[in-house]
Amino acid sequence: MSSHSQFALLKQRRFLPFFATQAFGAFNDNVYRQAIIGLLFFLGVSTEERTLYTNLAPALFILPYFLFSATAGQIAEKLEKSRLIRITTSMEIAIMSLAAIGFLTQNMVLLLVALFCTGLQSTLFGPVKYSILPSVLKREELTGGNG
């Protein structure tokens, strides 16, 4: 067994695009949820309404995981993985375009619908991001790829 840095994977064309897609997707989801909460403070909504939206937002993001995880796994098994990654990344761009409209119009309903769709996109991407690694990494690289 050779001793090499797992960070060397980040220089590999077979891993870096996948890693960047995964990292930017997670960053996007977190920034978006926080931006919704920030908008509530900016709009000066009542404490009760702010509490409602602050609790509703994470629930709407998590709900698709409960509703669609099994279906997402089946879809991931049927479609070619790189194609599904392109589809889910395109979905993310479309959803964030919808969210941008929601921010411009300060429409909380539209922002929450986009948040639910973001959760759905993450649910669809989840099975692919875990199942593609064994097909693109060597056995000794899997620990670094998963970590």
Question: In which residue ranges do the predicted regions lie?
Answer:
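Short, Lys/Arg-rich, polar N-terminal cytosolic tail immediately upstream
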Residues: 1-11
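Short secondary-structure boundary/capping segments
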Residues: 7-8, 102, 124, 134
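Helix-loop interface residues and adjacent transmembrane-helix termini in multi-pass membrane transporters
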Residues: 12, 48, 78, 104-105, ...
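Juxtamembrane loop-transmembrane helix junctions in multi-pass integral membrane proteins
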Residues: 13, 45-52, 83, 106
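Substrate-agnostic recognition of the 12-TM MFS/MFS-like secondary transporter fold
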Residues: 16-34, 57-95, 110-147
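Extracellular/periplasmic helix-loop-helix junction of adjacent transmembrane segments
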Residues: 35-65
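Short helix-capping/hinge motifs at transmembrane helix termini and TM-loop junctions
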Residues: 44-46, 69, 102-107, 122
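MFS-fold secondary transporters
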Residues: 98-103, 118
